[in-house]
Amino acid sequence: SAETAVYTPTEANLKARQEFRDSGLGIFIHWGIYSMFGQNEWYLNRGVNAQEYAKAASGFYPAGFNADQWVEAFKKAGARYVCFTTRHHDGFSMWNTSQSGYNIVDATPFGRDILRELSDACQKQDMRLHLYYSHLDWTRPDYPQGRTGHETGRDSTLANWPTYYKFMNAQLTELLTDYGPI
C-alpha cells in the first residue's frame, strides 16, 4: 500500500501565508490575447484551433497600458499587492521570454515587456508583485493532454513530459530571477 506523504510547512512558508492574509486587498490581472475576443482566459478551450488563435497575437496592441498609472490606481484603491498572469493555458507569455517566440515582445506589434514595466512600477511604488503561471499549455505539442484543451488541434502523440518540464522550468527560472522581488 502506498503511504500518504505528510506536508509540514516551513517557518518561512508559514510567515509568507500570514503576510498574505495580512495584505488585505490585492489586484489579480488576467490579461492576454483572449482579452481581444471579449472572452475569458479559457476561450481557447471552446474548440478554437490553436494555430488560428495564435494569429491574433499579431493584432495585440494594448496602447493604453501604463504600468506606473496602473500601480498608482491600485494603491489608491487600497491594494497592497498585484498578481499578474504571466502565461495562461493558451501558452502566450506576457513577458520577453527567451524560451519561445510566442510572447508579448516577439509575437505582437506592441513589442514591449509588460511584465518588466509592471515589475519596475511595483518596485518604484512599493507594491508587492506576485506572478501567476499556468502549468497547462493548450498550444505546445509536447504538453500532454489532460482533461482540458482537447479541441485545439494539437497532435496528442507528440506529448513529451521531459521536454515540456525543461521548457516550463526554464520559463519559471526567468520569472523568478529576472523580475525583481517576487
Q: Which sequence ranges carry the predicted segments?
A:
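Mature catalytic domains of secreted/periplasmic carbohydrate-active enzymes
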Residues: A2-I182
